Amino acid sequence: MTTTTISHHPHKNKAFASLLGFLLGLLGAHRFYLHGSKDGWGWLHLAPLPASLALRQLLPEADWFYQILPLILSALAGFLEALVLGLTPDDKWDARYNAGSGRLSDTGWPLAVVLVATLMLGAGVLIATMARLFDLLYTGGAYG
């Protein structure tokens, strides 16, 4: 007698993955949702937290912006990943993340809202980061 095993993989929601990248991309939550706890890139998203704490302890006289810069860079990477995930076509998304789920993705307006919010906040954070960094590097922080 032969038995066949049916592997059931949970369906991964593209809008939810993008929302996680938008809200918690700093901590790599979207990576853990998609790939599980063994994802190395997800754990790399957590590395800036102890790095920022170490900078705060080792360089207490440094400007606060330098101390949180690793966190900002991780957040910007999370925003970028949220955009990449959300803009992936549904058929490619299903082939990569939902091959064994037995369901097809059908994204709608919630994903569009997440993508617009991600682009707005991500662009704003990037511009503010560049402005503050250039201010600190070229004027020593004279403008703030």
PLM regions and their residue ranges:
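Transmembrane helix recognition focused on a "late"/terminal membrane span
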Residues: 2-18, 43-144
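N-terminal signal-anchor/start-transfer transmembrane helix
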Residues: 20-31
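Alpha-helical transmembrane segments of integral membrane proteins, especially early/N-terminal helices
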Residues: 31-45
